[in-house]
Amino acid sequence: MADLRATYRLQLGAGLDFAAARALVPYLRDLGVSHLYLSPSFQARADSTHGYDVTDPGRISEELGGEEGFRELASAGLGVILDIVPNHMAADGENRCWADPALRTRFFDVDPVTGRHRRFFDIDQLAGVRQEDPEVFAETHRLALRLVRDGLVDGLRIDHPDGLADPAAYLRRLRSDGVERVWVEKILDPGEPLRDWPVEGTVGYEFLNDAAALFVDPAGEDVLTRVCPPSPPFPAIAWQAKLEQVRGTFAPEVQRLRRLSDAPDLERALSSLPVYRTYIPPAEDADRDALAGNPVRDLLLSGEAPKEFVTRFQQTTPAVMAKGVEDTAFYRYNRLLALNEVGGDPSRFGISVERFHGGCLERARRFPRGLLITQTHDTKRSGDVRARIGALAGMADEWAEYVRRWRSLVPDGAPPSWNEAYLILQTLVGAWPLELQRLEAYAEKALREAKVNTNWVEPDAQYERGVRDWCRGLYANRAFVDDLEVLAERVARAGECSALGQTLLKLTAPGVPDVYQGDELWALSLVDPDNRRPVDWD
C-alpha cells in the first residue's frame, strides 16, 4: 500500500479513460501526488457522464477501458483511491438487478404498497440500494473488495453514506472485510463533529468552508448586508426552502412515513433539522441537540417509534437538506457567494484564527488522514472564484459603490430580478474573464435552482430568455465592461493572495491535501457542468 501524501481527483469519462489517466501519471508524480482519486469506475449507464449511475457494481466500465485498463493504470506508479456508490444504482433496463422483478425487490428499497422506490434525492432514475441486507452488500461489493485485496486499490471514497439505513454498520462491515482506508462524503454542519466511525475522515468540505471563511474580512459584513438586495435572514430562507421541498419534491417520501407512524407535524420535523441527519439508535448527545424543539424528538428518542419509521426519517432528512439548502437557499441568499458552499453557513461571516486552529487540532487528534479540499466536482464554484468573491469583503465600500452604479442596469419589473442580477454580478467579478455562453448556462442553472421565477420542473422559457438577453446586453455595454474590468483586476489580485493562502493551508494543515483536476493552476470554474469541462493537460 502506497504511503499517503496527496491525492489528485480525476473525473473519468469519454474524454479521460484509464489509458489517458495513465499518461498523466509521470506529471502527477512530479507534482508530488501519491494517489489518483478516481471518480466511480464501475459499469454505468451507456450515456453516463459521471459514473454515479452504476448498472453493474461487479464489472469495471468497458467505456473507460475495462479491468485490463484499470489494472494497467493501478500499476503505473501511483496508488488508487476509488469512489464507490453504495447508496444507489441506476433504475434502468441495463441494470439486471433492476430489470428482474425478483432481484429488484431484493436489492432495492421498494415500497410494497405503492411500488415506488427510495430515490437518490429527487432523481427517479437512481434507486436506493438495501445495503443493510448482508447478501446485497456482498453482491454489490464483491469487485470493490477484490480490488482492495489484490492491492490495486488503496482506499475507498464512500458516496452519500447518509442515504444508507445504518452508515456506521456499513462502515464497520467494510473495515471487517479488509478495507483499511475509507473516506466518507459526509457533509457536516459548521461545528458538527464527525461520528466515531472506522474511517480516515471526510472528503474535506469542513476544511474548505473554514479556510474560505478565514480569508473573509468580518469588517465588511455590515456594508455587504446593506448593499445586497433586501432578504430575510439565511436561516429563515433555508427553512422555507426545505419546507417547500418536503411538501413538493419529497411528498411521496412523506406519505410513506405517514403510513408508518402518526408522528406530529411531520413536514416541520423534516424541515427543522439543523444537520443532515441523526444516527439513532443509539442516540448520542449530538442527536439530542439536533432534535431540540423538533416535533418528533420524543418519538425518535423514546425507542417506541417503529424501527422502519426511524430509519426512513433519517434517510429522508439528508435529501431535504441537500435540495432545500444546497440547491435552493444557496441561490436565494446572495450576500456573499463565497460563503454559499456545500456544508457551509452563509450567515457565518468569517471565522477567527483561533477557531480555524481549533478545527485543525481536532482533525489532527481524531482524523489526521482526512482529506483537505478547496474544490470538488460538487462545489458551487472553484477555489479561485470563491477566493475572489470572498475578497469583496475586504473592499466592501468600493464594491458598494460599483453596485450602486450597476443597479441602474437592472430595470424593475423585467428579468432578472435585482436579487438574481446581484448573484450574476458577483459571479462575473469572481470569474472574469468569462465567456458569455458560460455565463448564460450558469445563470439558467442558478435561477432554476432558486425556484423563484423559473425551475427545473416547469421552466419559464420567456423569463429565461429575458435573463439571457440581459446578460448579452451587459456584454455589449462597453461602459459596463470597462467598469467591470477595472474592479475585476483589483479583485483578482486580492483573490490570488487569498487563494494562495488557502492552498498553503491545504498543503500544511493536518490532513491529506486533495487537488481537483486542473486546480494546480488558476481555475475559474463555476458549478457543474462548468467545473467538469475537459482539462488542457498540455
Question: Each predicted region: which residue ranges?
Answer:
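Metal-dependent catalytic core segments for phosphate chemistry
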Residues: R119-D122, P198-V199, V203, N209, ...
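N- or domain-start disorder-to-order transition segments that initiate the globular core
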Residues: V129-D133
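Structured alpha-helical segments in the cores of large, soluble enzyme domains
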Residues: V136-R149
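Conserved short loop/turn motifs at secondary-structure junctions
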Residues: R157-L164, L425, V429
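Conserved phosphate/anionic-ligand binding catalytic regions in large, soluble enzymes, centered on
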Residues: L270-T278, V325, R369-V385, I424-L434, ...
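Extended, charge-enriched "interface" segments that sit outside catalytic cores
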Residues: A290-R297, G303-P306, G370, V385-A492, ...
